[in-house]
């Protein structure tokens, strides 16, 4: 369990008082003649006086290059028309989610129509039965077939799809880790196909990169969702190459409505079981290797990262199957005896026993303080049910403070066994507000508003799904807390833009680009 409270860095914050700082003394005491000449120049003098920040400052002092503005790229490729929503705007998020759901449904249906025969051959006829059940297309005599057996079929089919995806990912990673001469024919073909996709992705990213400014945080956008999915999918389960509709594990599940059937029959919401359409580390690697080929071992790392997300989903469905369904059956039987209802139907009361509070579902839950809400907000990030972990990430942009803390496990019907460690969300939130109240940088009005906010519950602004693993999400949160250079790049522009950038850095991660400068060579030629 960990807790970190830290001051946030912004551009200009450190250089503002450069003349009287240790940095200024260091400049005067340690630089050589060449650097002195440079420092005495107009730009150099302005830098030392704290009027100009940037690469010049870091070159003279030998400090990190972090005070210069570089390209910061969000590690996500946005489809056409997509934008990162403001976390404090539920309406904006809701509209985006609905549009995305409709697009996915349409695309998944195309996959079902195109590959139905191959998919049912690979994963069994149960998929069609589940689909017909959801669409009300069951034959007359089958209308009253047992709902519990249909639920089990949906869970089993989903597990099959996830396991197939997991094993294919493992095969590709293994092929990439082998020497080229030791690969089998199948592995050579697999690697070649994957390389072609990476090249297509690299070209698309390169075109976007050329148009970027050396400014704040950038987003790679403009690829259509179909092309993106085909290009970024490591191992399509059915359909190969760069087809515009590939049957990924995610697409098959959506096409046959497995999660919807599970939710409709049991009340268990599995909408959090996702994997990233495009693994953030592959974008980071592509941005690093601009003019050279990406080594196989780097590609293997990205594939293994994506495999981790799929394995996490496998563990989650196994947890539902082994831990939750037996309890579900037991409660169902008890309910039948009490109510004297038909054997084939699941009573709604049974489903309600397995509903969990919205704020404990595995998502990023967004809250704001009741007063000064634009500046003071926090995220409560909850892991998959089988892990039963969560963390708190709070921001006060008024006084530039960030607070990260691992929280205690929470009890609900779908969780694992409890472990009494860590604090609750309420305790973390109150301490977070205490920081704002006691900070010397807080104005009297801000402190008074925070005292008022502490006495009441925060405002819940809704939830968002995350596609990466919980571990990756936690690493992103800790990087926001520790990495001063990243903070400088995301804390720029209007407040709503800063909040968007924070959310992007948490959900996807950010890659900061910037070529390293040879300081001795630069000073020699100054």
Curated annotation (Swiss-Prot):
One Pfam assignment: Orbi_VP5
Chain coiled-coil ranges: none
Primary location group: virion
Biological process annotations from GO: symbiont entry into host cell via permeabilization of host membrane
Keyword Cell cycle recorded: no
Signal sequence, start to end: none
InterPro entries, A to Z: Capsid_VP5_Orbivir
Localization (cell): Virion
GO cellular component, one term: viral outer capsid
Keywords: Capsid protein, Outer capsid protein, Viral penetration into host cytoplasm, Viral penetration via permeabilization of host membrane, Virion, Virus entry into host cell
One MF annotation (Gene Ontology) recorded for this entry: structural molecule activity
Biological role stated in the UniProt entry: VP5 protein is one of the two proteins (with VP2) which constitute the virus particle outer capsid. Acts as a membrane permeabilization protein that mediates release of viral particles from endosomal compartments into the cytoplasm. Permeabilization activity is probably negatively regulated by VP2 and is triggered by endosomal degradation of VP2 and exposure to low pH.
Record-stated family: Belongs to the orbivirus VP5 family.
Protein name: Outer capsid protein VP5
Name of the coding gene: Segment-6
């Amino acid at each position: 369990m960990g807790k970190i409270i830290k001051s946030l860095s912004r551009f200009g914050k450190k250089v503002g008082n450069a003349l009287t700082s240790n940095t200024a003394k260091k400049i005067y005491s340690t630089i050589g003649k060449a650097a002195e000449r440079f420092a005495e120049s107009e730009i150099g003098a302005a830098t030392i006086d704290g009027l100009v920040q940037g690469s010049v400052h870091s070159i003279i002092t030998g400090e990190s290059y972090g005070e210069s503005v570089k390209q910061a790229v969000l590690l996500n490729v946005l489809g056409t028309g997509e934008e990162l929503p403001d976390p404090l705007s539920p309406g904006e998020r809701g509209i985006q989610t609905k549009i995305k759901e409709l697009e996915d449904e349409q695309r998944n249906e195309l996959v079902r129509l195109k590959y139905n025969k191959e998919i049912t051959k690979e994963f069994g006829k149960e998929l069609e039965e589940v689909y017909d059940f959801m669409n009300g297309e069951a034959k007359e005599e089958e209308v009253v077939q047992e709902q519990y057996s249909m639920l089990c079929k949906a869970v089993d089919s989903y597990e099959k799809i996830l396991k197939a995806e997991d094993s294919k990912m493992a095969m590709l990673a293994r092929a990439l880790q082998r020497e080229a001469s030791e690969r089998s024919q199948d592995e050579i073909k697999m690697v070649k196909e994957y390389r072609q996709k990476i090249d297509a992705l690299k070209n698309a990213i390169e075109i976007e990169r050329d148009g970027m400014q050396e400014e704040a945080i950038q987003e790679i956008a403009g690829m259509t969702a179909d092309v993106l999915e085909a290009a970024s999918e490591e191992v399509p389960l059915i359909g190969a190459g760069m087809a515009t509709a590939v049957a990924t594990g995610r697409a098959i599940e959506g096409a046959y409505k497995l999660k919807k059937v599970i939710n409709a029959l049991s009340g268990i919401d599995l909408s959090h079981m996702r994997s990233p359409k495009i693994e953030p580390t592959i974008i980071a690697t592509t941005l690093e290797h601009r003019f050279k080929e990406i080594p196989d071992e780097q590609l293997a790392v990205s594939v293994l990262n994506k495999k981790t997300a799929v394995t996490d989903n496998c563990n989650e469905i196994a947890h539902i199957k082994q831990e939750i369904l037996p309890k579900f059956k037991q409660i169902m039987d008890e309910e039948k005896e009490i109510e004297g209802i038909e054997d084939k139907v699941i009573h709604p009361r049974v489903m309600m026993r397995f509903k969990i509070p919205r704020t404990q579902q595995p998502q990023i839950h967004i809250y704001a303080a009741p007063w000064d809400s634009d500046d003071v907000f926090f995220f409560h990030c909850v892991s998959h049910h089988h892990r039963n972990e969560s963390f708190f990430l709070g921001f006060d942009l008024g006084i530039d403070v960030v607070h990260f803390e691992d929280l205690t496990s929470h009890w609900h019907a779908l969780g694992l066994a409890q472990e009494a460690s860590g604090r609750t969300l309420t305790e973390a939130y109150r301490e977070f507000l205490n920081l704002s109240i006691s900070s010397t940088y807080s104005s009297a009005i801000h402190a008074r508003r925070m005292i008022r906010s502490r006495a009441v519950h925060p405002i819940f602004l809704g939830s968002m799904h995350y596609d990466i693993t919980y571990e990756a999400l936690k690493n992103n949160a800790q990087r926001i807390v520790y990495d001063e250079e990243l903070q400088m790049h995301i804390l720029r522009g209007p407040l709503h833009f800063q909040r968007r950038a924070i959310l992007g850095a948490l959900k996807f991660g950010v890659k900061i680009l910037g070529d390293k400068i040879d300081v001795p060579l630069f000073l020699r030629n100054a």
